[in-house]
Amino acid sequence: NTAGLDDSQMVEATKGVEPKYLKDEKGNQEINPHAFLDPTVGIAMAENVTAALAEALPERAEHIEEKGAEYKAMLESIDADYREQIGALPKEDRVLVASEHAFQYMVDTYGMEQLYIWQIDTDENGSPAQIGHLVRQLKDKRPKHLFVESNVDTRPMKTVSKEAGIPIFDEPLHSDELGKPGTVAGTYEDFLRSNLKTMIAGLKR
């Protein structure tokens, strides 16, 4: 919420990140807001926020830059884990099937493919046409499991699972909000690590 803030108080956290776009069946297009699901975007965001805070608070710049470097190093470690663990999967198993096209940035970075029921959140999410399209795609793509995000209706993917004959993995992916403190997605670090753990467990044969 940026109400009441002027431009000098706002930071473009995703500065330098190439946007990716979503389209609905009618051709409407919007920027995919889920860039943060990609750890490399998290690294860029950490750099941008650290630089902006250090500039805004020069008297605390040294401390800010130190903490920013620590946070960046943590994200670089997560990025390395994503590259190693996803890279160890056979190419044909690097197919992530989820309800919405939230993981567009992440799959592009780590050499995966995402299939989905819908791209843009609308009142028609999980329509018969969308479900049928994904089921047809899954005649050729046969991942070990399908996935459902923690914040979406599970019914459309259950229909896909039944028609395609592919089970849904029992742990959800996280695509939007953090979880409550102390949960598996209670911090951004936990959020990213939880998604990697879930993906690998669900895709590895």
Predicted regions and their residues:
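Extracytoplasmic metal-acquisition and chelation regions
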Residues: 1-205
